[in-house]
Amino acid sequence: MISITEWQKIGVGITGFGVFFILFGILLYFDSVLLAFGNLLFLTGLSLIIGLRRTFAFFFQRHKLKGTSFFLGGVAIVLLRWPLLGMLLEAYGFISLFKGFFPVVFGFLGSAFNIPFLSTLFQKLQGSSSSMV
């Protein structure tokens, strides 16, 4: 079993609050203050979960620089109070950065939710890779 430190537990909570504020900001017609606060909490929580060095190593890999620039550029534009454009840039950057994790997530969701229609939908979204590791 992998031991989780107290900092990682705090990071999970902060990341959860960040996602909540981002979703709540979208729900309230792209409220720029909530989106900016959610972005800052999300990035802070992510760096607490995996550490600063691994966060920088993840975001600044050579093949992920395009996604990183769109994601962090979107965060900056949201902070400058252009929420719709910033969230569009962030969404593209997020998909570009985390596209390698999507088959794993869809595979987990397909096995976690054993509902016939949803499991077949997640299996189609998962693609050819069925490995959970």
From Swiss-Prot:
It is a multi-pass membrane protein. Residues 1-9, 53-68, 114-133 are cytoplasmic. Keywords: Golgi apparatus, Membrane, Protein transport, Transmembrane, Transmembrane helix, Transport. It is found in: Golgi apparatus membrane. GO terms for cellular component: cytosol; endoplasmic reticulum; Golgi cis cisterna; Golgi membrane; nuclear envelope; trans-Golgi network. Signal peptide: none annotated. One of its GO terms (biological process) is protein transport. InterPro entries: Got1, Vesicle_transpt_Got1/SFT2. The chain crosses the membrane at residues 10-30, 32-52, 69-89, 93-113. It comes from the Eukaryota. Residues 31, 90-92 are lumenal. May be involved in fusion of ER-derived transport vesicles with the Golgi complex. PANTHER family: CGI-141-RELATED/LIPASE CONTAINING PROTEIN, VESICLE TRANSPORT PROTEIN GOT1A. Belongs to the GOT1 family. This is Vesicle transport protein GOT1A. It comes from Mus musculus (Mouse).
